[in-house]
Every structure is written in structure tokens, then in C-alpha cells.
């Protein structure tokens, strides 16, 4: 058994390193205990460099440990991925309600720099503090800052420090968030452009100790640098419309229709042409991302992505291109890495990832700082079966928001690390900062914090019974969400009832039983049909038969029976009817009695008239002239009285039927 070990040790170091590079980290730590020779080989950085080659097929990648050793980088990356994979996600929901209106405005932009979240919607900026300040008794997690958008606003930009606005008349407005000036209204800057503002941006530096800087561009090629709200310098760099701006520390990047302008410290000006398409026309830029760490600009249209070196002290103007087989619909960049200066001493050359999302729900990861090839090279390709709404890339992971699912993947290999269920159905926002995630849609934000099981056990042991389990929190949040939906529905119903009362003097009760409502509607429809039929027959001169009278009589008896049943039931439950209800009931009974009297009278008159018209003639009717004249006068009076009675009874019938319908609806 010792001879194979001796033979393995006698192999050349290059072969042993190649063999060991296919082993796992645990196996390597076991091997180093076998012999001093193995220990020396395992501590050799060339072995760990080969580990990256065998697993991710490259030695160019963003640094995670910010170390020059591949061994440290490999171990730290493994630990970071283990953290995302095994830690439990604790979700907290925040609803942004800046006003008391029923229809809350949706969030337009969001910035996440842990522990602060800044959300912007029209008229309000919301600052969310995710860290609890236990020493402050009146600490508020949500701070609503009024920020009315100026009229005639043509463009705006928003970050954690300020919100700036440009108008069509050349004026610039802003509100600072880094100090107590956020309590003041939106202020106008001391200066203006000679034409409409077409582009504006804040400095991408999130250092709150620095002054707040911004830059704006106009449609006639003017550039103005602002410090706080004061004009620092104006420079007309072009005669064309300024479409895009990027500003970070001493560097300002400007793009018009044809050229890119790079300005250093508001003095040195360098320019370069925009890449041209197949027709030798400047490309139509749809996506614009800037990596200030390597001074590399990313431009993309629907089918191609370009990287241009804009470093005047380096490989200025170097252009690389990647043609995509599918149409591009979104481009994201690792923002934190792009704002840190590239350090070539770090393991992997301190790369920077971008992600390209296509219309076929395919995600491409590219290291734009990888200069090992003449063109851009795809690090990994990830395909999804469901629609990808939004994604975010960092130096370690890629986070993808699908319907009701959040997936976390290894940015190097595309391997799925973790899946978080029951998230947003239609996510609109997704940000990652310091191993924490903010996602949301509409005016709702979900904060995901990943904690280890050990810390959770310690948390439970320290707080004991006062600690509420995460499952209970999720159940409570779900029930609160259902309660909010019910409350919104109730408010809408109440608003509709109030509108009907104001408009028609009545309301429509929407919360009743559906079967009872249908029954009432059918009865009302029956009464209306009977009324229409009786009216048509009366207009045609046809006598209304006894069937209609019998139906009306049965309807009256049924109404009275229902009323008596309801009255008896109410009496059995406590006799709590008041005087006003008794008066209404007595009035209703009087109406029924009066209708019966009118009905009997109308039937008697009708039968008398019909019998006189169709009955056999008798000699007694013509005994004397005086008797005939008296009979004729009596007949005329009866005829007139009958016609008047019929008209009156018709009016009474209409009122009676309407009263019956209303009484049925009240009883039911």
C-alpha cells in the first residue's frame, strides 16, 4: 500500500497540480495531511489557479475577496455561495403610502444602498431605514419627503443623495437628501440653459461626506456642472442634442447623436465617434452603462453590444463587439464594482460583470474587463422556461425575478444556488446590496435578509418566548394582506353607495345574498310585465279578465302573508320594532285594504257593464218612456263612472305594484 503513495509523490509537480485541480476543497485539505510534499503543492497558488480553469474555464473574473491569492479567492467565493445557498430568507413587507388617497402612486425608481432604501414616485421621495436604532425612542423606518415634480419637467435623475429635474425652458431644480435641506421645497438652481434640458444626472458617488454634484445637458449641446444648487461651470461641447450623461468624481461622459465626449476635471476634452451600423450610420443606442473602474463604456442596441475604452491614459478608443442571436431587452451592470477602480493585482484581474437579457428569456453573463480575447466573450448562458421580469448581477451571483419565484445563481457557472418562493407575481424592481435583496412592484417593497440557522437559534435563545417564528410572521403578513384587500373592497363599495345616494337619493346594497337579490329582481320584473300587459290591454279596449285580477289578488295575499310572517318572527326575537316601523306597517296595511276595496269596486263595475252590454234584452226594460229615459240616464252615469273608476284603478294599481315591489325588497 505504500508503493502507490511513493509513486504518486514521485510524479512531477505539474502533473500533480493538474490532478489535484480536479479535486474538491475538502479533499485537498485531507491530502495535505499525508505528506509535506503534498502540503507544499496544495499551498502553491498555481494549483488554485488551475482550479478556476477546470471549473469556470477562465482565470479572469471579478474579485470577491479583494486578494491577490487565488487560494483565498477560491475559498471566499465558496463560503459566499454557501451563505446564499444554506441561509434562510426572512422577508419583511413595506407598503409605501405617502398620501391618504385610495389610489396610491406606483414607485417609479428605487435605489438600494444598505441600510438605506430610497424610492421615488411622482410627488414623494420615501426613505426606508432597514437598521433599527434602539437608542432612538422615536425612530421611524419610513420617512416621506414631499418632492413635487416641477411643471414642464423634461428629464430627471434620482439617487440616494438627491433628486434633480430639468425643464423644457432650460431651468434646473433639485432637492437634496443628504442633510436637513430635504425639509425645504424643491429649489431652483442658480442658473439655466439657453435651451431645453435633455439629460441630467447626479454624481454616482454615494459618499455622503462629499458635496452633492450634478451635471445637465441641453438640446443645443450645453453642459453645466452644479455643486449643490450653484452653477460651477458651463461649457458648450457640441451643436447637437445631448442624449446621455454619466458623472463620477472627476470624470464626465457625454453622448450626442454622433460622438462621445470625455471630460476630466471639467477641463480636458476628448472625443470619439459612436460605433456605426451596417449602413454606416451611428448606431441607435438603447442601453448605456458606464464602468468607471476601468473607464469602459457599454453601448447596446437590439442586436449588438459594444464596449469602448474611454480612458485617455490607456487603450483609448478600443472597440469590441458581440452580436447577439436574440433581441436584447435589458442590460444590467455590477454597480459596486463599476464604481471601484480596477486593481490588476487582484486574483482574476478584478473583472466586472454585465448581464444581457433577451426576449427569449435567456441571460448572458459577460466580463467586460476581460482582455484575453479580441472580442467580447460570454462567461455563461442561462435559459429560463418562464418569463424573466428583472435581474441583477453582482461579482458573485445573479438574481433573477420570475413570477412568484426568485432564483439566485452562480454568476460564473450559471448554477442554481437557491430558490425563494412566494414572491411578487409581477416583479418590477430588484436590487442587491451586502447580501440583502429588495424587490417589489406597485407601491409594495419586500426586503429579504438571509440569516444562518445558528444565528437564528441564538436569536431564539436570547429572546425566548417573546420571539415570533418566521412562519408565524409570514402567516400574519398574509392575513394582513387579505385584510387590506377586504378593506379596500369595503371602501370601494361604500364609495359607490355614497355616489348613488348623492346622485339618485338611494343606494345599491352590494353585500347582500345573491339568490335573494335575483329573487327580488325576478319578482319586480314579473310585476312590471303584468303592469305593461294590463296597460296595453286597456289601451286596446280589451277587458282585463278575471285571471289578472286573481293574480293580483294572490300577489296581495302573498305580500301580506310574508309581512305577517316577518312581523311574527320579529316579535318572537324580542319585539324591538320602534314607532317609526309601526307607522310604516300600518300605512302599508291601509294601502292593502284600500287596494282591496278599489279592486272589488272595479270588478263590480266591470261585471255590471259587461252584463248590461252582453245580456239578453227584456221587455221590462222598455215598459214606459219614462222608465227608458231613466234607464238610459242611469246607464250613461254608470258608463262615465266606470271609465273614471278604471283610470283611477289603473293609477292605483301602478302605485300599488311599486309599493309591493319595494316592500318585497325590504322584507327580503
UniProtKB/Swiss-Prot annotation:
Substrate recognition component of a SCF (SKP1-CUL1-F-box protein) E3 ubiquitin-protein ligase complex which mediates the ubiquitination and subsequent proteasomal degradation of target proteins. Probably recognizes and binds to phosphorylated target proteins. It comes from Saccharomyces cerevisiae (strain ATCC 204508 / S288c) (Baker's yeast). GO terms for cellular component: cytoplasm; nucleus; SCF ubiquitin ligase complex. Pathway: Protein modification; protein ubiquitination. Keywords: Phosphoprotein, Repeat, Ubl conjugation pathway. The gene is UFO1. Residues 564-585, 599-639 are annotated as: Disordered. Pfam families: F-box-like. This is Ubiquitin ligase complex F-box protein UFO1. Gene3D superfamilies: 1.20.1280.50, YVTN repeat-like/Quinoprotein amine dehydrogenase. Residues 564-578 have a biased composition (Polar residues). It comes from the Eukaryota. Present with 639 molecules/cell in log phase SD medium. SUPFAM superfamilies: F-box domain (SSF81383), WD40 repeat-like (SSF50978). The modification Phosphoserine is found at residue 511. Residues 5-51 form the F-box domain. The modification Phosphothreonine is found at residue 514. PROSITE patterns: FBOX, UIM. SMART domains: FBOX, UIM. InterPro entries: F-box-like_dom_sf (IPR036047), F-box_dom (IPR001810), SCF_F-box/WD-repeat (IPR052301), UIM_dom (IPR003903), WD40/YVTN_repeat-like_dom_sf (IPR015943), WD40_repeat_dom_sf (IPR036322). GO terms for biological process: cellular response to methylmercury; DNA damage response; protein ubiquitination; SCF-dependent proteasomal ubiquitin-dependent protein catabolic process; ubiquitin-dependent protein catabolic process. Interacts with SKP1. Component of the probable SCF(UFO1) complex containing CDC53, SKP1, RBX1 and UFO1. Residues 547-566, 583-602, 651-668 form the UIM domain. GO terms for molecular function: protein-macromolecule adaptor activity.
Amino acid at each position: 500500500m505504500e508503493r502507490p503513495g511513493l509513486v504518486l509523490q514521485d510524479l512531477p509537480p505539474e502533473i500533480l497540480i493538474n490532478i489535484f485541480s480536479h479535486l474538491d476543497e475538502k479533499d485537498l485539505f485531507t491530502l495535505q495531511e499525508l505528506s509535506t510534499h503534498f502540503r507544499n503543492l496544495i499551498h502553491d497558488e498555481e494549483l488554485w489557479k488551475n482550479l478556476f480553469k477546470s471549473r469556470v474555464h477562465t482565470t479572469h473574473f471579478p474579485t470577491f475577496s479583494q486578494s491577490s491569492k487565488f487560494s483565498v479567492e477560491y475559498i471566499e467565493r465558496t463560503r459566499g455561495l454557501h451563505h446564499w445557498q444554506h441561509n434562510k430568507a426572512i422577508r419583511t413587507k413595506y407598503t409605501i403610502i405617502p398620501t391618504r388617497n385610495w389610489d396610491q402612486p406606483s414607485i417609479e425608481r428605487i435605489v438600494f444602498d444598505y441600510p438605506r432604501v430610497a424610492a421615488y414616485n411622482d410627488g414623494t421621495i420615501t426613505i426606508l431605514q432597514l437598521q433599527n436604532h434602539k437608542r432612538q425612542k422615536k425612530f421611524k423606518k419610513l420617512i416621506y419627503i414631499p418632492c413635487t415634480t416641477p411643471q414642464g419637467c423634461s428629464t430627471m435623475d434620482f439617487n440616494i443623495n438627491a433628486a434633480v429635474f430639468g425643464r423644457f425652458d432650460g431651468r434646473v431644480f433639485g432637492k437634496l437628501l443628504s442633510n436637513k435641506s430635504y425639509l425645504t421645497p424643491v429649489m431652483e438652481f442658480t442658473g439655466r440653459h439657453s435651451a431645453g434640458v435633455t439629460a441630467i444626472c447626479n454624481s454616482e458617488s454615494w459618499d455622503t461626506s462629499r458635496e452633492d454634484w450634478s451635471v445637465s445637458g441641453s438640446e443645443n449641446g450645453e453642459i453645466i456642472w452644479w455643486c449643490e444648487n450653484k452653477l460651477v461651470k458651463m461649457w458648450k461641447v457640441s451643436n447637437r442634442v445631448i442624449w446621455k450623461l454619466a458623472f463620477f468624481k472627476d470624470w464626465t461622459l457625454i453622448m450626442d447623436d454622433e460622438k462621445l465626449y470625455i471630460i476630466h476635471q471639467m477641463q480636458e476634452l476628448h472625443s470619439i465617434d459612436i460605433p456605426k451600423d451596417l449602413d454606416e450610420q451611428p448606431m441607435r443606442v438603447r442601453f448605456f452603462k458606464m464602468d468607471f473602474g476601468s473607464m469602459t463604456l457599454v453601448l447596446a442596441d437590439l442586436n449588438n453590444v459594444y464596449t469602448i475604452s474611454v480612458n485617455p491614459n490607456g487603450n483609448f478608443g478600443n472597440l469590441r463587439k458581440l452580436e447577439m442571436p436574440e433581441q436584447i431587452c435589458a442590460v444590467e451592470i455590477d454597480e459596486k464594482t463599476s464604481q471601484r477602480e480596477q486593481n490588476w493585482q487582484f486574483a482574476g484581474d478584478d473583472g466586472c460583470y454585465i448581464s444581457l437579457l433577451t426576449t427569449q428569456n435567456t441571460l448572458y453573463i459577460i466580463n467586460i474587463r476581460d482582455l484575453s480575447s479580441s472580442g467580447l466573450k460570454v462567461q455563461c448562458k442561462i435559459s429560463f422556461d418562464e418569463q424573466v421580469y428583472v435581474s441583477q448581477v453582482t461579482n458573485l451571483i445573479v438574481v433573477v425575478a420570475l413570477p412568484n419565484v426568485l432564483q439566485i445563481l452562480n454568476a460564473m457557472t450559471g448554477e442554481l444556488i437557491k430558490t425563494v418562493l412566494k414572491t411578487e407575481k409581477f416583479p418590477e424592481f430588484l436590487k442587491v446590496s451586502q447580501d440583502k435583496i429588495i424587490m417589489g412592484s406597485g407601491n409594495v417593497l419586500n426586503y429579504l435578509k438571509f440569516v444562518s440557522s445558528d444565528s437564528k437559534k441564538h436569536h431564539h435563545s436570547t429572546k425566548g418566548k417573546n420571539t415570533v417564528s418566521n412562519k408565524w410572521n409570514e402567516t400574519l403578513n398574509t392575513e394582513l394582506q387579505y385584510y387590506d384587500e377586504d378593506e379596500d373592497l369595503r371602501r370601494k363599495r361604500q364609495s359607490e353607495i355614497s355616489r348613488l345616494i348623492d346622485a339618485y337619493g338611494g343606494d345599491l346594497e352590494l353585500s347582500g345574498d345573491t339568490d335573494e337579490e335575483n329573487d327580488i329582481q325576478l319578482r319586480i320584473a314579473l310585476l312590471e310585465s303584468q303592469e305593461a300587459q294590463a296597460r296595453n290591454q286597456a289601451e286596446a279596449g280589451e277587458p282585463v279578465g278575471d285571471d289578472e285580477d286573481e293574480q293580483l289578488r294572490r300577489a296581495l295575499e302573498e305580500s301580506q302573508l310574508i309581512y305577517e310572517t316577518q312581523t311574527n318572527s320579529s316579535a318572537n326575537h324580542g319585539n324591538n320594532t320602534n314607532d317609526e316601523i309601526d307607522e310604516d306597517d300600518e300605512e302599508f296595511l291601509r294601502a292593502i285594504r284600500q287596494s282591496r276595496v278599489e279592486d272589488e269596486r272595479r270588478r263590480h263595475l266591470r261585471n255590471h257593464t259587461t252584463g248590461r252590454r252582453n245580456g239578453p234584452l227584456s221587455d221590462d226594460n222598455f215598459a214606459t218612456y219614462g222608465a227608458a229615459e231613466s234607464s238610459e240616464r242611469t246607464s250613461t252615469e254608470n258608463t262615465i263612472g266606470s271609465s273614471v273608476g278604471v283610470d283611477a284603478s289603473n293609477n292605483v294599481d301602478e302605485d300599488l305594484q311599486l309599493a309591493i315591489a319595494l316592500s318585497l325588497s325590504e322584507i327580503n
